């Protein structure tokens, strides 16, 4: 693998002298600061919790007056840049911002989780007039593709003091055909009063994807512990509440777990069935409840996958085929005696027997059974499962001890899947390759997506080691990408409390359960980050109608999904929401034909101490730093493991602290080997950073940079990173950006010059009389405008030395510039009139002289 052997970095890059000199250069440059007034902060401080009683997600943000630093050039080998203050001052600024957070929140939802190309995006939010004046309250939504602002939308409503209004479908819309296919977008929304004071603010991702398989965001739906792991109609309100939140987390595909009657009769067309094979909870499934959930999933634009084993027959049901079609053990082991039918047992009680995947009779039977089941339930595909790998024999060789007559089940999975795809061409299909160790055998199978359930005891893709670290998760994601070109879906279950038969806890997570504790928030987020940064997707979210969800969305803790004994805190639910926004908004940077980069970035503290120790990510107590590359861009992933271990599952629970030491004022070096100095200077102007963590919540900021050379004369990019909580992503845009011509005399915010339909109510000693409310309501001003191509692009925040606040650097703007063209025509037209008038006056004067 590309990253299994790290090369020694150039001595000139790695030397403490070079790093120290660069840090001094960053900190000692005297800046002249050009203040800009009334610029809203793109940096969002820590949000208030999601209100579990409302559907959708609420986001709060702080706004600050910003300052813009002028770009200065240090020398001929350095990039003109905005410099950053000393670490101690910067830390004080960040802490102050944390303390200044307010409780104003946007309740922002969309009508779907994902959109087809050409579909309009309907936004739903509540405008609140929290002021003492009756006035126009305006919602402004800016649509971004990476650093580029594409479009600005506004919706204005005249509201009395303390009055609220929730937009209806069709009132606040991103127009159809505005967004490209297979792209993630960030929607930055703020609500302001008539004086442009920001009242509320929040970010939300939008996904436009005709094909969910490109960027799968997979979640589970399972039975409720309230009713013995059953799926019942009476619990639909709880499921709907979770699905509404998951819609706003942009989930585009769902895995319906254990809603089947039996492995050979998965979903019969009956009102209700018992899962008689399930002796531990005797679960029931009401088919109308399942169909209602499938329908709700479809309404959000997502797909519904029916879970079932690919080879199994439940032990308590009559065989559907003769013994000749079973598979038999070659060796005695966990699946029974050699020469016997392969059997899976729990507590020595048989649960499932297994058929031969090469059996034509079985292939015909199970394909027909699944086709009928998916038709009955309205499902879109089959989430296949296996019990693991085993060396087996066909019936006619079941007594043989010759290994040449045997085969591994994994050797024939691809053939079986391809046969199923031929027989079920209208349905999606995927298989759980447990631990992902058989990708070389499955790479050419006709799976629509690749799904692996990973366990620490599995063998890592890095080699002869268990896959227990964050780096092992990345290695598996990398391996699947290299073999198939697909983004791996990872079932990685968190903490997994374990008890003995007497309910005695066997690990720290189990002791947390007995203490009624929650998941450790950062443990869950770091696993999600490790998988997503590598280009995969962590399937951890689940709708389980479980009281332990705390009004939020469930998190999977073990392979039997209805079991969720740890609680989900409001903090974890809120942060899961923001991580899903990030993964969606930046899907093209994370997993759009993105590969490992051979460049080896390094991370240092402000005093020059190196924090990046191994790019493989198998060691803790470091800033795990590595690079990826895509089409005309590169990324540097920074994952904070400072002060914590690198194990991803965290079975120790709170006994193993997984909250790393937050880092500020970091310096990242990135070698640009083979790049000319002129090209390096250009690239250094296009370096940005974003993070799902509370300090940014997916906003993208420009970064201070310098270019230096190493001892070989190759340029090295030095990047200032203001803060690292858990996960930062540096984005380097390598495209050549054309200069955008400026339109003279264009207002910075043209929409704000619109006059209200009725005068703004002046300040009064007493509130408006109630008797006047109806008359005022009849004349409320409603304005909806779509603005594109504004002269001044959004200014993304960076840190300046003098102001010690977050400023915003102007970024290029793309997209449909109809408004700009319209304004240009107005300017040209006005100019033509002036020229014509001047010519006429000149002609008149000339005639008078004659």
Swiss-Prot record:
InterPro entries: Glyco_hydro_66, Glyco_hydro_b, Ig-like_fold, LPXTG_anchor. The modification Pentaglycyl murein peptidoglycan amidated threonine is found at residue 814. PROSITE patterns: GRAM_POS_ANCHORING (PS50847). Residues 18-28, 44-79 have a biased composition (Polar residues). Residues 1-80 are annotated as: Disordered. It comes from the Bacteria. Residues 29-39 have a biased composition (Basic and acidic residues). Its EC number is 3.2.1.11. GO terms for cellular component: extracellular region. Keywords: Cell wall, Glycosidase, Hydrolase, Peptidoglycan-anchor, Secreted, Signal. It is a peptidoglycan-anchor. GO terms for molecular function: dextranase activity. Residues 815-850 form a propeptide. The keyword Lipid metabolism does not apply. It is found in: Secreted, Cell wall. Pfam families: Glyco_hydro_66, Gram_pos_anchor. Belongs to the glycosyl hydrolase 66 family. May play a role in sucrose-independent adherence to the pellicle-coated tooth surface. Homodimer. This is Dextranase. It comes from Streptococcus mutans serotype c (strain ATCC 700610 / UA159).
